[in-house]
């Protein structure tokens, strides 16, 4: 008899394909699990589900551990495996611009995702490109409304996670001109989180074994085949768009072979959050990160 396992996403997109493929590709079923997944309500982290016991594994980010640490409290969960080792957001313009530079953002209004981590990363990417983000004509159209606002004519640029930018390209509304992940480089961006108690179980070891297999498959498999497997998870996304998005993330190097969240990657995330003024000190790796169950 299959064992139920509950997985919750904080956000849901093709960017999280390593976890989606673990479900869609049958890797969890091979380990005796019957997976069910959900998406946390907008503005709520999936970490809350771990804390109340309704969720076994959450798609989250190591930075979620910073808020309780800033208050002198230990986080209710730890992050034990990476999903993405680079930011997965893009800058999309209304017209193709093969000579785009970040400096051009000064001359056009840009709709920016104002979620905590996406905004911090955008600020840091601007910094890395010699820009003060405060000098930019930024528009906050709302995370769930910004895509339609751009389609309706608001702004000259938009900052989004895939597959939204690729869908804009497919629809003839925009053209991707830059990658935030490319601007910043490797860091601890998105991850799998669980409680320390759950990570000590055989269930956690079996889950991690399935996740390692899914991740290797994702790296070695053509994007079109991955899109076929994941298509039912994205009923409103054109198959070609899903394929292009997955291929873009493969090429960008978001999905590396190791599942561990490395110390160097974590240190860069601390750099980003210090730059954004969201943390007052550099938190310990061990307070946020755990090693994957063997």
What are these regions (language model features)?
Residues 2-131, 137-140, 156-162, 173-178, ...:
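Short, glycine-/small- and polar/acidic-enriched structural segments
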Residues 145-233:
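Pocket-lining segment of extracytoplasmic ligand-binding domains
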Residues 282-294:
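Hinge/cleft segment of the Venus flytrap/periplasmic-binding protein
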Residues 20, 63-66, 123, 166, ...:
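Predominant activation on well-ordered alpha-helical scaffold segments within soluble catalytic domains
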Residues 1-2, 294:
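Basic/polar N-terminal segments that are highly enriched at the extreme N-terminus
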Residues 107, 170, 290:
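Phosphate-coordinating loops and pocket residues in cytosolic domains that bind phosphorylated ligands
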Residues 200-280:
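Secondary-structure end/capping motifs
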């Amino acid at each position: 008899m299959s064992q139920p396992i509950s997985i919750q996403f904080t956000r849901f997109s093709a960017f999280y394909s390593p976890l989606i493929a673990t479900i869609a590709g049958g890797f969890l079923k091979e380990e005796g699990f019957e997976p069910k997944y959900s998406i946390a309500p907008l503005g709520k982290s999936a970490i809350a589900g771990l804390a109340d016991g309704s969720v076994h594994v959450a798609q989250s980010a190591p930075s979620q551990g910073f808020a309780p640490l800033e208050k002198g409290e230990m986080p209710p969960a730890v992050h034990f495996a990476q999903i993405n080792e680079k930011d997965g957001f893009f800058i999309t313009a209304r017209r193709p611009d093969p000579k785009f530079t970040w400096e051009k953002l000064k001359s056009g209004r840009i709709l920016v995702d104002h979620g905590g981590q996406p905004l911090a990363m955008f600020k840091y990417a601007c910094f890395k490109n010699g820009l003060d983000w405060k000098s930019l004509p930024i528009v906050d159209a709302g995370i769930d409304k910004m895509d339609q606002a751009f389609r309706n004519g608001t702004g000259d640029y938009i900052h989004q996670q895939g597959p939204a930018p690729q869908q804009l390209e497919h629809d003839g509304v925009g053209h991707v001109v830059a990658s935030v992940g490319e601007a910043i480089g490797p860091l601890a961006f998105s991850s799998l989180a669980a409680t320390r108690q759950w990570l000590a179980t055989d269930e956690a070891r079996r889950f991690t074994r399935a996740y390692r297999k899914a991740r290797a498959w994702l790296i070695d498999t053509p994007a079109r085949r991955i899109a076929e497997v994941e298509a039912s998870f994205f009923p409103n996304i054109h198959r070609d768009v899903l394929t292009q998005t997955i291929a873009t993330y493969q090429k960008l190097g978001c999905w590396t072979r190791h599942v561990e969240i490395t110390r160097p990657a974590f240190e860069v995330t601390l750099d980003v959050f210090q730059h954004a003024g969201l943390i007052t000190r550099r938190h310990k790796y061990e307070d946020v990160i755990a090693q994957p169950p063997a």
